[in-house]
UniProtKB/Swiss-Prot annotation:
Record protein name field: Shikimate kinase
Main location as per UniProt: cytoplasm
Keyword match Transferase: yes
Sample GO molecular function, one term: ATP binding
Quaternary structure annotation from Swiss-Prot or TrEMBL: Monomer.
Annotated function: Catalyzes the specific phosphorylation of the 3-hydroxyl group of shikimic acid using ATP as a cosubstrate.
Cofactor(s) needed by this chain: Mg(2+)
GO-annotated biological processes: amino acid biosynthetic process; aromatic amino acid family biosynthetic process; chorismate biosynthetic process
Keyword Amino-acid biosynthesis: yes
Length: 172
């Protein structure tokens, strides 16, 4: 089975939905942010603060190179992974990429008490979310499937991903 790759903006449900999909299919979940944290032995926030976004993205690329070679897993990526076309190509070689969409307003609600997101630290959170989403949306739209997490619970989103994925797999 091809990997199920989840991407989308922070707060779109990648980790939660990824966990549900992996549990339902009885396969492993690999969270690229968790892999980066293991490599640096720092939180994402600390990595950005100490090393900057450039070093974070370099590490993210190494992690993508490694996890994209795995088989039969759910891969939950960081929200900015799609900004590098090489990351997308690596993930697509052995996977199907699902973009989890959430509106800026819902992302703000989901992240309102979360102060660990380095790209939302300065200025108005909603403005930052909208600005970053506008930059990333063309990249997200290049994914294989879009799942709207504004209108689906995590459980229903997981079921929809599994349904799409199994239908696609049966045609291979």
């Amino acid at each position: 089975m091809k990997n199920i790759v989840l991407t989308g903006f922070m707060g779109s449900g990648k980790t939660t939905i990824g966990r549900l999909v992996a549990e339902k299919l009885n396969i492993d979940l690999v969270d690229t942010d968790s892999e980066i944290i293991k490599e640096f032995k720092l939180t994402i926030d600390q990595i950005f603060e100490i090393h900057g976004e450039k070093k974070f993205r370099e590490c993210e690329k190494r992690v993508i190179e490694r996890v994209s070679k795995l088989e039969n897993v759910v891969i939950s990526t960081g929200g900015g992974v799609v900004l590098d076309p090489e990351n997308v190509n690596l993930l697509r070689k052995n996977g199907v990429i699902y973009f989890l969409y959430a509106s800026p307003e819902n992302i703000l609600k989901r992240l309102k008490d979360d102060n660990t997101r380095p790209l939302l630290k300065n200025g108005d959170k909603l403005s930052n979310i909208i600005r970053l989403m506008n930059i990333r949306m063309p990249f997200y739209k290049n994914c294989d499937f879009e799942i709207n997490t504004d209108i689906l619970s995590p459980e229903l989103a997981a079921e929809k991903i599994i349904s799409i994925h199994m239908a696609k797999e049966s045609k291979r």
